[in-house]
């Protein structure tokens, strides 16, 4: 069974940092692109970061809203995806999800999602 389990959310003051984790199991972690997506209260889902697969050297990509503040990385030995979040702002308050990318030519799908972890940025 393929599973994604996020953790690490919580309450943090503006300007603070958090590191989210996404523990994965049931598939070959290195073969897949992995994504971070968030949903602020009352708003739509927003893609924020990607970690490409081993074949693409685990290169990364970020949305403009988090670039320079957030860093996505992997522990390939433990099959964990991370999101280091720095210089947090009130507008970063959201439920954060990790998702697996699946390629079925000619389309990409986020085919497996975790349950999410909540981040609240407030003083």
Curated annotation (Swiss-Prot):
Which GO CC terms are listed, alphabetically?
extracellular region; immunoglobulin complex
Instruction: Decide whether keyword Nucleus is in the record.
Output: no
Which Gene3D superfamilies does the annotation name? Immunoglobulins
Record InterPro entries: Ig-like_dom, Ig-like_dom_sf, Ig-like_fold, Ig_sub, Ig_V-set, IgHV
One GO BP? immunoglobulin mediated immune response
Molecular function, one GO term: antigen binding
Between which residues do disulfide bridges form? none
Instruction: For this UniProt record, give its keywords in alphabetical order, as a comma-separated list.
Output: Adaptive immunity, Hybridoma, Immunity, Immunoglobulin
Domain called Ig-like: residue spans: 1-114
A Pfam family for this UniProt protein? V-set
Q: What else is known?
A: This chain was isolated from a myeloma protein that binds phosphorylcholine.
Question: What is the protein name stated in its UniProt record?
Answer: Ig heavy chain V region HPCM6
Q: What is the lineage of its organism?
A: Eukaryota, Metazoa, Chordata, Craniata, Vertebrata
């Amino acid at each position: 069974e393929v599973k994604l389990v996020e953790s690490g959310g919580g309450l943090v003051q503006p300007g603070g940092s958090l590191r989210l984790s996404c523990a994965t199991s049931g598939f070959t972690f290195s073969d897949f692109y992995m994504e971070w997506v968030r949903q602020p209260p009352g708003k739509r889902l927003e893609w924020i970061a990607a970690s490409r697969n081993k074949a693409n050297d685990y290169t990364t990509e970020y949305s403009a809203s988090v670039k320079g503040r957030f860093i996505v990385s992997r522990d390939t030995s433990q099959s964990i995806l991370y999101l280091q979040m720095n210089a947090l702002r009130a507008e970063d308050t959201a439920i954060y999800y990790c998702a697996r990318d699946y390629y079925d030519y000619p389309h990409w799908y986020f085919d497996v999602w975790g349950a999410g972890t909540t981040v609240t940025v407030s003083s």
